[in-house]
């Protein structure tokens, strides 16, 4: 069975209750299904908190965090350090043998600078599956932060949805983007069950899909097109539904190629 990539985001990393529910669901799923799993994560809330403590400005452009040279080391520490090791500690609590990685390990993705105006913000593309396949075949759970490294050796902050998309392409994996919301919502706050590129363009033009959700939807559409299969956007808040979601049942918004 092809691997499943689960991207974690939102305030999940700040909530012990949410992490407990998530890892309990992961344990249940792994016991019932011999399917390779990969976790990909960002940690925007952790970064925002750290920036506030350090009195550094937080600037976002089109839903992406502007990352100047004097912040990339701090953001790397927050994502590849604190956020990644927090998830590893939860895996250990639940007897899951996990390995902490970033996008640069084993050349799993190829990362280039996205836009000079954004600073040290990268775009990830599919790379070599060798390292991840080796870990998965040995029964490990890779936990991958969204920090990338360019061919020139520069650290890059990559949007975690886009990072997960690139890794899904690397592995030919199914992809689930977990977030704070139950899926993509229409103008009345109701969940949209299915989303096409045409429908997404309409909702963006109408100002219903905005900011970070635009990045998330575009990443999901890119992944659905590249993989030739749907991608799910769903909430981590309903833990009892997560095993069904991991097993292919749509509980959020299903993005169609």
From Swiss-Prot:
The lineage of its organism: Bacteria, Pseudomonadati, Pseudomonadota, Gammaproteobacteria, Enterobacterales. Pfam families: AA_kinase (PF00696). Pathway: Amino-acid biosynthesis; L-arginine biosynthesis; N(2)-acetyl-L-ornithine from L-glutamate: step 2/4. It catalyses: N-acetyl-L-glutamate + ATP = N-acetyl-L-glutamyl 5-phosphate + ADP. Its main location: cytoplasm. One of its GO terms (biological process) is L-arginine biosynthetic process. The record marks 7, 216 as: Transition state stabilizer. Keywords: Amino-acid biosynthesis, Arginine biosynthesis, ATP-binding, Cytoplasm, Kinase, Nucleotide-binding, Transferase. GO terms for molecular function: acetylglutamate kinase activity; ATP binding. Coiled coil: none annotated. One of its GO terms (cellular component) is cytoplasm. This is Acetylglutamate kinase. Substrate binds at residues 43-44, 65, 157. ATP binds at residues 180-185, 208-210. It comes from Pectobacterium carotovorum subsp. carotovorum (strain PC1).
């Amino acid at each position: 069975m092809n691997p499943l990539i689960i991207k974690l985001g939102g305030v999940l990393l700040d909530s012990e209750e949410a992490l407990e529910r998530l890892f309990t669901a992961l344990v249940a799923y792994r016991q019932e299904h011999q399917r390779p799993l990969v976790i990909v994560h960002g940690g925007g809330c952790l970064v925002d908190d750290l920036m506030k403590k350090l009195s550094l400005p937080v600037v976002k452009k089109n839903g992406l965090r502007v990352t100047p040279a004097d912040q990339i080391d701090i953001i790397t520490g927050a994502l590849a350090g604190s956020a990644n090791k927090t998830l590893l500690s939860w895996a250990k609590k639940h007897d899951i043998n996990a390995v902490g990685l970033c996008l640069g390990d084993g050349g799993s993705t190829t990362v280039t600078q996205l836009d000079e105006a954004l600073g040290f913000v990268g775009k990830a593309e599919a790379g070599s599956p060798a390292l991840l396949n080796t870990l998965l075949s040995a029964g490990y759970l890779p936990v991958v932060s969204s920090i990338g490294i360019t061919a020139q050796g520069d650290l890059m902050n990559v949007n975690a949805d886009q990072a997960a998309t690139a890794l899904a392409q690397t592995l030919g994996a199914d992809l689930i983007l977990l977030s704070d919301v139950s899926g993509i919502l229409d103008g009345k706050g109701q969940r949209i069950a299915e989303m096409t590129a045409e429908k997404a363009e309409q909702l963006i033009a109408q100002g219903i899909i905005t900011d970070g959700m635009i990045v998330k939807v575009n990443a999901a559409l890119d992944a659905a097109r590249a993989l030739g299969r749907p991608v799910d956007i769903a909430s981590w808040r309903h833990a009892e539904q997560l095993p069904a979601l991991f097993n292919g049942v749509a509980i959020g918004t299903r993005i169609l190629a």
